[in-house]
Amino acid sequence: MAERTFAIIKPDATRRNLEGPILSVIQQNGLRVVAMKKMRLTREQAEGFYHVHKERPFFASLTDFMTSGPIVAMVLEGDNAVARWRELMGATNPENAAEGTIRRQFAEGLEANSVHGSDAAETAAFEMGYFFNAMEITG
C-alpha cells in the first residue's frame, strides 16, 4: 500500500543546484513527488518545524542553517515511503552513509547533509501538515 513521507532538500544542496540530481534519485527509486515547493524559511518557521530539538545544543545552529538559503519541501509517495526515503538519504552523518546514498554523494557535513526525511509515519503526518494543506498534495 502506498505511504507518504516528508522530505526537504536543504540549503547546502539548493545552493549547489542539486535539486535535479536529488529528484532523479527519488524518482528512479520508486517514489513519486506529490507535492513540492521551493521556499526560504523564516526564523519562526524553522524554529516551529524543529521544535522537538529546542532544548538540544545544536538547535540554534540548525535553525541558522535552515534559514541560510532556499529549501525544497516535498511530499513523497510510494510503497514503504518512510523507510525507502530514509534508506536513499543514508546515515545522518555522511561519513557513515552507505555508498550510493544521497548524503554520501552530496552532503558537505553533519548539519549540511543535503536532505531531511521524516523518521516515522506519525512524524511525516505532522511535517507534511506544517508545509502543505490537503489541496496542495496531489496523488
From Swiss-Prot:
Q: Name one GO cellular component term.
A: cytoplasm
Residue positions annotated to bind ATP are 10, 58, 86, 92, 103, 113
Q: Write down the top EC class of this protein.
A: transferase
Where does it mainly reside?
cytoplasm
InterPro entries referenced in this protein's UniProt entry, alphabetically: NDK-like_dom, NDK-like_dom_sf, Nucleoside_diP_kinase
Q: Which GO terms describe its molecular function?
A: ATP binding; metal ion binding; nucleoside diphosphate kinase activity
Query: In its UniProt entry, what is this protein called?
Result: Nucleoside diphosphate kinase
UniProt xrefs under NCBIfam families: PRK00668.1 (NF001908)
Q: Which Pfam families match?
A: NDK
The family line of this record is: Belongs to the NDK family.
Per its Swiss-Prot or TrEMBL entry, what cofactor is needed?
Answer: Mg(2+)
Matching SMART domains: NDK (SM00562)
Subcellular localization, per the record? Cytoplasm
- Return the EC number: 2.7.4.6
Keyword hit for Phosphoprotein: yes
Identify the keywords attached in UniProt to this record, alphabetized.
ATP-binding, Cytoplasm, Kinase, Magnesium, Metal-binding, Nucleotide metabolism, Nucleotide-binding, Phosphoprotein, Transferase
Subunit details: Homotetramer.
**Active site annotation, chain numbering:** 116 (pros-phosphohistidine intermediate)
Q: What does this protein do?
A: Major role in the synthesis of nucleoside triphosphates other than ATP. The ATP gamma phosphate is transferred to the NDP beta phosphate via a ping-pong mechanism, using a phosphorylated active-site intermediate.
One annotated GO biological process: UTP biosynthetic process
Annotated catalysed reactions: a 2'-deoxyribonucleoside 5'-diphosphate + ATP = a 2'-deoxyribonucleoside 5'-triphosphate + ADP; a ribonucleoside 5'-diphosphate + ATP = a ribonucleoside 5'-triphosphate + ADP
